[in-house]
Structures are given as C-alpha cells and as structure tokens.
Amino acid sequence: MAQRTRLGDLLRPLNSEYGKVVPGWGTTPVMGIFMALFLVFLLIILQLYNKSLILEGINVNWNGLGLG
C-alpha cells in the first residue's frame, strides 16, 4: 500500500478531476496556438543556425557552444 505524505496531501486536489471528461473541445485550441508558436520559435532558431535569417548588427557564433 502507498505511503501517505504531506506532499501527496497537498497535491491531491489537483488530481480530484481524474477520469472526468468535459464535453466539447475544452482547451484544445489554446494548446494548438501554443504548439504553433513553439514551431515558429524552433524555425527561427533553425534559420539562425543555418544563417538563412540574418539580423543586422548581431553576430551569431555557434562555435562557443560546440555546435559548429
């Protein structure tokens, strides 16, 4: 049997809705927006790494990170 702890007692209310499903889409659109923003962030990092996105006055040197 599981041991009861103070931390478990504090976190129990967060798990009280386990197994319940709210009808409809819920927060799915919000998740989709954040996934799209994360994709844009990753694409910008990739373009900076490939030097296909050039920012004036900013020198990008990846050698210090051991990446290049």
From Swiss-Prot:
InterPro entries: PSII_PsbH, PSII_PsbH_sf. It is a single-pass membrane protein. Signal peptide: none annotated. One of its GO terms (molecular function) is phosphate ion binding. Keywords: Membrane, Photosynthesis, Photosystem II, Thylakoid, Transmembrane, Transmembrane helix. Its main location: membrane. The keyword DNA repair does not apply. It comes from Synechococcus sp. (strain CC9311). HAMAP family: PSII_PsbH. Belongs to the PsbH family. GO terms for cellular component: photosystem II; plasma membrane-derived thylakoid membrane. It comes from the Bacteria. This is Photosystem II reaction center protein H. One of its GO terms (biological process) is photosynthesis. PSII is composed of 1 copy each of membrane proteins PsbA, PsbB, PsbC, PsbD, PsbE, PsbF, PsbH, PsbI, PsbJ, PsbK, PsbL, PsbM, PsbT, PsbX, PsbY, PsbZ, Psb30/Ycf12, peripheral proteins PsbO, CyanoQ (PsbQ), PsbU, PsbV and a large number of cofactors. It forms dimeric complexes. The chain crosses the membrane at residues 29-49.
